[in-house]
């Protein structure tokens, strides 16, 4: 579920001269997930896979994706000494609708580094993502498997 924390990292690093679109974000998410060891068919990538299946998906500049991935990685390391993989692999539940994305994470797994960076703040409406985004910590969220 932590993959969507990258939206706040991108929001902080984004420059008006380099606008994002859903296809770019989908490729960037797939790239970050792949580097973190997340399989392409993982449910966390549902949004990215749906975007890339849409008719009219534009060709992507892979160099631009790699450059942005590097910029995010450096910012995370410099700001909080945390890897993108540690962020992306955070467990939780994701609810995705046509207009909203809600990410619920276990309260007992809240990470002070992520909190300090503001990655878990609700960004609200992100026009370049096309949805309202909210993050929640909850004691009722249960996850299994390895935790970073």
Where do the protein language model's features map onto the residues?
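Short, compositionally biased pre-sequence/patch detector
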Residues: 1-148
């Amino acid at each position: 579920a932590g993959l969507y924390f990258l939206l706040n990292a991108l929001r902080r690093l984004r420059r008006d001269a380099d606008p994002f679109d859903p296809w770019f974000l989908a490729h960037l998410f797939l790239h970050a997930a792949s580097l973190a060891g997340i399989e392409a068919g993982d449910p966390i990538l549902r949004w990215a896979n749906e975007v890339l299946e849409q008719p009219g998906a534009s060709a992507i500049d892979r160099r631009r994706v790699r450059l942005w991935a590097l910029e995010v990685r450096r910012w995370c390391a410099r700001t909080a000494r945390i890897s993108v993989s540690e962020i992306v692999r955070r467990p939780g539940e994701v609810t995705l609708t046509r207009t909203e994305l809600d990410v619920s994470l276990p309260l007992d797994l809240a990470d002070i580094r992520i909190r300090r960076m503001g990655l878990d703040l609700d960004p609200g409406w992100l026009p370049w993502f096309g949805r309202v985004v909210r993050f929640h910590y909850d004691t009722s969220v249960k996850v299994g498997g390895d935790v970073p």
